[in-house]
Amino acid sequence: MYLPSDDSFLLAECASKYHGKSALEIGVGSGIVLSLLCKNFKIVAGTDINLEALRFCINNVPYCVLLACCDAASAFHYNFDLIVSNPPYLPNDNDNEKDFTVHGGVSGVETAIHIVKSATLALAKHGKMLIVLSTFSNISKIDELMKNMRLKRTLIKERKLFFETLSVHEISFR
């Protein structure tokens, strides 16, 4: 289970400015962002591939949340107003040392790309997606995906840390 860190708090800060009927968090981790979404949305759902993270959320997140153990947004056939995700974003080409909570693939964005593709199937036409990216990741691959899927990416907020810059981006349909 991914414990809250600078990236989690940055996503929570950005997500707190959104309101609507329904929200989904992909990769709930400890549930810090999920809890915040309950304050601004009537219907809140969360997914994680880690059953331990979901068990933790059951005991620590408000009862208003629907939780599903699944890959990205694959369990939902619903159009959410907001989808948020803090996917693993560190590059790693060594499968033997891969930590699925932080390593997002060879270029760091493979997991994020998979999540965006899945999320767009569950996103309302007017909906928004918030995603955390890092300067350690190959963001040009995200831009290529945006172009191919006719999506728009807007930088919402950045936080410079000692070794990297974290950023939250809003993704929407064009």
Spans of features found by a protein language model:
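Conserved SAM/SAH cofactor-binding pocket of Class I
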Residues: 4-85, 91-92
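Soluble or luminal CAZymes and related metallo-dependent hydrolases
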Residues: 7, 49, 107, 111, ...
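Conserved Class I SAM-dependent methyltransferase catalytic core
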Residues: 13, 111-170
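Glycine-rich, phosphate-binding/catalytic loops in enzymes
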Residues: 40, 99-102, 147-148
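Active-site-adjacent beta-strand anchor residues
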Residues: 47, 105, 131-132
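Short amphipathic alpha-helical segments
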Residues: 58-59, 95-98, 142-144
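Mobile active-site "lid"/loop adjacent to the S-adenosyl-L-methionine
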Residues: 87-114
